Amino acid sequence: MKSLLFVTIAVYFVAQAVTANLLSNFLGSSLIDDDKGNMHKLYKRSEDQCIGRSCTCDTSSTSCCPYAACRCNLWKTSCKCQRTGRKWATPCKEIYSPN
């Protein structure tokens, strides 16, 4: 019984591998290249986003928008992006995209 189950699972995985190989040969490698490009665009978009002023931030990253810095109280809690210098930062939005 165990050997029959093992053979069934092995045949299933071989069939999946053959189907995937035939499908990739039929469609070409353009789908794989497109996926890599799309993932790069998604990663780039997440880099462009920042946290607006007066919103909660994390001190371990530079996630605040330009002209804002992540500042915490004495006990390193309730950290928020606050204005730096004389220039004004963006209004509070949880995720702000400058582009």
From Swiss-Prot:
Stored CDD domains: Spider_toxin
Main location: secreted
Positions annotated as propeptide: 20-45
Database matches in InterPro entries: Spidertoxin (IPR004169)
Tissue specificity remark: Expressed by the venom gland.
Post-translational modification: Contains 5 disulfide bonds.
Keyword line: Disulfide bond, Secreted, Signal, Toxin
Record family assignment: Belongs to the neurotoxin 02 (plectoxin) family.
Protein name from the UniProt record: U8-agatoxin-Ao1a
Organism (species): Agelena orientalis (Funnel-web spider)
